[in-house]
């Protein structure tokens, strides 16, 4: 488990950028060159930190999202676990979904 966490941290450090003002992560295309487990855990961690929720989205939904990203099947914004996920050129943006509780 420690070795997987090492590669998850390494993947996040090397292949993502965080913009604090917009609470947004930008993932480059090398993010998805890792093993499936590393991608899954990295994406789960990023979505959990952006959305601010205690629980992350269901595993099956995250797996489906990873498949769509790898096959370039994301055409518009996708919402998952309180986050917007969208593909722009060769990068993926993960930002917080605006809540309607006002």
Q: Where do the protein language model's features map onto the residues?
A:
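AMP-forming adenylation/ATP pyrophosphatase catalytic core
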Residues: 1-102
């Amino acid at each position: 488990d420690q070795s997987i966490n090492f590669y998850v941290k390494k993947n996040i450090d090397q292949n993502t950028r965080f913009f604090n003002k917009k609470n947004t992560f930008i993932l480059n295309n090398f993010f998805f060159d890792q093993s499936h487990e590393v991608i899954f855990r990295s994406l789960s961690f990023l979505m959990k930190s952006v959305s601010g929720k205690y629980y992350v989205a269901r595993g099956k939904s995250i797996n489906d999202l990873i498949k769509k990203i790898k096959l370039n099947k994301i055409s518009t914004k996708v919402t998952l676990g309180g986050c917007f996920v969208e593909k722009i050129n060769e990068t993926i943006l993960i930002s917080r979904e605006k809540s309607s509780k006002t």
